[in-house]
Amino acid sequence: MSPSAGQRQTQEDLTTCRRGQIWDRRHKHCLKRKSGVLPDADMAEYAYALAKADRYAEALETLDLLQNPNTARALNYRGYATRKLGRTQEGIGFYLKSIEIDPNYAQVREYLGEAYVLQGNVGAAKEQLNRIAKICGSTDCEEYEDLEFAISHNGEEKS
């Protein structure tokens, strides 16, 4: 099943493979990380899992191998890893490119809002919070709750 069908890479998948390799979920083994070895969607999800595991540089290296790096999801993940490396303004640039492609992508708006909080721009973060509420149809969605937490806790992320 592909991540677009709701599966995400797990921490177990990350520890299975050494640096420079990527987990092939379908065939259950590690492959040398190179362009085209897996569909872009799978590579992007693996990159995001690397970033969530604090392996930001590896995440960016994986995203560099995408055949089409200019999807909303790939740009969001690049923004996330870049921001986590301390390059907040550069990360914001990737988030804004992602939003140009898909203005209704709630997760990128959450991460953009978190970046604004880090810069002290709470007003801009609250604008993203309002957009997320409209996208989700309520305030009862993970992206809204996570950004609301970051705003009220000076940029701290929920665990």
Residue locations for each model-derived region?
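Residue-level recognition of tetratricopeptide repeat
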Residues: 71, 105, 139-141
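Alpha-helical segment of the N-proximal tetratricopeptide repeat
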Residues: 36-69, 73
